[in-house]
């Protein structure tokens, strides 16, 4: 089951929490879900090159129903803040116009972007669109993540790889990625790369460690030194779709 499902959704309520947090009446739920979708779409379109990894939306206090707290996690906070906060103020104005509510915008810096699955996948997509060879793209991403301290990394690219007539899937993995272990902190992302040969699908799994009793997901994502990069006996694993000698990538 862990091989089929989205690792982020599978761990919600166990070791992960929701990115939208609010308590309202049943009649208000559809409108707020749509509003959250439009808020995230506006922020991502407004700051496309700011490497946004996560957007948290909170409406927790009943006394402040007309107030929304938005936390943007980004590897490039200066792009969103701008000179003297001008860019941030423009974004807040657009959000107020969209929601017709008071908006409190927090910009949080992602200290190590090489261990964030979404940022890694976006970086891989950008390189593929610039016609870099797909195997090199995967190996570079895995090496950076392991060097940054990830305990396990797995990548998968699907589509017309290298301009081939028949689409296939090919992936690489290094370290442990225990998808069936619910206490395992696994960061997952899936993005698309639009190339001249068509659309390529990119999936990335990052294993940060196990969340033990009394710990939170923040404990496993602290910066730690990579011990695996100094192990000469470790060999990366490769797998290709449609080849009986390897793991079937489509089932992963």
UniProtKB/Swiss-Prot annotation:
One of its GO terms (cellular component) is cytosolic small ribosomal subunit. The keyword Ubl conjugation does not apply. One of its GO terms (molecular function) is rRNA binding. Residues 226-252 are annotated as: Disordered. Pfam families: KH_2 (PF07650), Ribosomal_S3_C (PF00189). Keywords: Ribonucleoprotein, Ribosomal protein, RNA-binding, rRNA-binding. The keyword Zinc-finger does not apply. It comes from the Bacteria. SMART domains: KH (SM00322). One of its GO terms (biological process) is translation. InterPro entries: KH_dom, KH_dom-like_a/b, KH_dom_type_2, KH_sf_prok-type, Ribosomal_S3_C_sf, Ribosomal_uS3_bac-typ, Ribosomal_uS3_C, Ribosomal_uS3_CS. Residues 39-111 form the KH type-2 domain. Belongs to the universal ribosomal protein uS3 family. HAMAP family: Ribosomal_uS3_B. Part of the 30S ribosomal subunit. Forms a tight complex with proteins S10 and S14. Binds the lower part of the 30S subunit head. Binds mRNA in the 70S ribosome, positioning it for translation. This is Small ribosomal subunit protein uS3. It comes from Aster yellows witches'-broom phytoplasma (strain AYWB). The gene is rpsC.
